[in-house]
Amino acid sequence: MGLEKSFILFPLLILVLGWVQSSLGKESPAMKFERQHMDSTGSSSSSPTYCNQMMKRRNMTQGSCKPVNTFVHEPLVDVHAVCSQENVTCKNGQKNCYKSHSTLHITDCRLKGSSKYPNCQYQTSQQQKHIIVACEGNPSVPVHXDAXV
């Protein structure tokens, strides 16, 4: 009887361990936001190749070229604080977007018209704009960059 239980429990244990391992490897929406949009150092954001380098480094040119992306060059705590600022309607109609009170230093990356995967080439543009982010969770943190205005 003990051996029969082992044959039943062992596959169940393997399934549970597989599920735990796969869930540990998943990127949360907040982590994805940080990977795709945060660059607090902004060390070389003035370089014309900044977007080409960062889009590749942050895995936004795998399988296709992401057409538009914004990097924010402010401390993460300041970007998190936007989630408690002016509540605005998101582009998709949802009500969980927030607009920064002040303008922030950002870099706008736009895919050049002639650029095609796998050679993704971006136009780099430094700007000072308000950001609008979608926020979720408790505490509320940014999970999506909605716009820069």
Swiss-Prot record:
Binding site for substrate: K32, R35, K66, P67, V68, N69, T70, K91, R110
Lineage of producing organism: Eukaryota, Metazoa, Chordata, Craniata, Vertebrata
Annotated Pfam families: RnaseA (PF00074)
Keyword entries, A-Z: Disulfide bond, Endonuclease, Glycoprotein, Hydrolase, Lyase, Nuclease, Secreted, Signal
An MF annotation (GO) of this entry: lyase activity
Subunit-level organization: Monomer. Interacts with and forms tight 1:1 complexes with RNH1. Dimerization of two such complexes may occur. Interaction with RNH1 inhibits this protein.
One GO BP: defense response to Gram-positive bacterium
Expression sites by tissue: Pancreas.
Listed name of the protein: Ribonuclease pancreatic
Main location: secreted
InterPro entries for the chain: RNaseA, RNaseA-like_dom_sf, RNaseA_AS, RNaseA_domain
EC number(s) reported in the record: 4.6.1.18
